[in-house]
């Protein structure tokens, strides 16, 4: 009898020491913050063993897979999260990001549209959807999204730069030059912006002196694509 009581006590102790679903999830998040993504996935899998309906664990696992550039596996995990609960914008946004990395721009836009419908306050959705629309050459819609971002934060240099690319695609070199000036004012290390500014100044407006100055700046910043322009058009 005493032996049986002993084993019952041991089992009760082990059971009480078993981490809860929330504790496992929180540890997975901690490991994510420490960039230990594979270990984090193991903890999220343990959560899902306890509760296969935990949509947050599927979403978090997808993020960890995304960080490992395992985009197809991430998409699968985000999709499972959505199947369990489609009321949160997060898995739609995250799945859109994975599609964006795969250059599956149309699928990305569809997910960003859904995410935006669920929460229109998330500025990152507008920016990333703008990138996907840029990839689809839907320039006017991309400009709209980048403008939404810039309304909230005019100092977002990447939004300025990508807006400029959309404006060039939309045959608006005047607007593009303004956006590119804004870009290099905000980020003086953006060689690609100096390059695009210089090319646009020379090709659209015949501004050789200013264009060459910006092309040389791009080259000095390590943007090697500027070299052929400098060699061909900017030698005295």
Give, region by region, the residue ranges found by the protein language model:
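Canonical tetratricopeptide repeat
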Residues: 60-63, 67, 94, 128-131, ...
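Helix-start (N-cap) detector for alpha-helical repeat units in TPR-like alpha-solenoids
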Residues: 21-22, 55-56, 89-90, 123-124, ...
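Structural signature of tandem alpha-helical TPR/SEL1-like repeats
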Residues: 34-42, 68-80, 102-114, 135-148, ...
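Terminal, low-structured helical/coil segments at or just beyond the last alpha-helical repeat
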Residues: 17, 23, 195, 199-236
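Structural marker of alpha-solenoid helical repeat scaffolds
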Residues: 50, 84, 118, 152, ...
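Alpha-helical segment of the N-proximal tetratricopeptide repeat
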Residues: 22-56, 60-63, 67, 97
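Bacterial Sec-dependent N-terminal signal peptides
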Residues: 1-27
């Amino acid at each position: 009898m005493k032996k049986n009581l002993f084993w019952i006590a041991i089992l009760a102790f082990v059971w009480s020491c078993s981490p809860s679903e929330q504790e496992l999830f929180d540890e997975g998040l901690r490991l994510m913050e420490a960039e230990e993504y594979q270990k984090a996935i193991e903890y999220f899998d343990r959560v899902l063993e306890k509760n296969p309906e935990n949509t947050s664990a599927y979403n978090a696992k997808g993020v960890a897979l995304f960080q490992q550039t395992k985009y197809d596996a991430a998409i699968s995990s985000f999709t499972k999260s959505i199947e369990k609960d489609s009321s949160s914008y997060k898995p739609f946004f995250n799945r859109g990001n994975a599609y964006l990395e795969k250059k599956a721009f149309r699928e990305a836009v569809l997910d960003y549209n859904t995410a935006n419908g669920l929460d229109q306050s998330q500025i990152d959705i507008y920016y990333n959807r703008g990138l996907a629309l840029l990839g689809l050459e839907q320039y006017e819609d991309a400009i709209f999204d980048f403008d939404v971002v810039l309304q909230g934060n005019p100092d977002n240099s990447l939004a300025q730069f990508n807006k400029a690319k959309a404006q060039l695609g939309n045959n608006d070199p005047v607007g593009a030059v303004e956006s590119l000036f804004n870009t290099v004012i905000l980020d003086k290390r953006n060689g690609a912006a100096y390059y695009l500014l210089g090319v646009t100044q020379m090709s659209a407006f015949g501004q050789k002196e200013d264009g060459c100055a910006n092309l040389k700046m791009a080259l000095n910043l390590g943007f090697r694509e500027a070299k052929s322009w400098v060699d061909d058009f900017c030698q005295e």
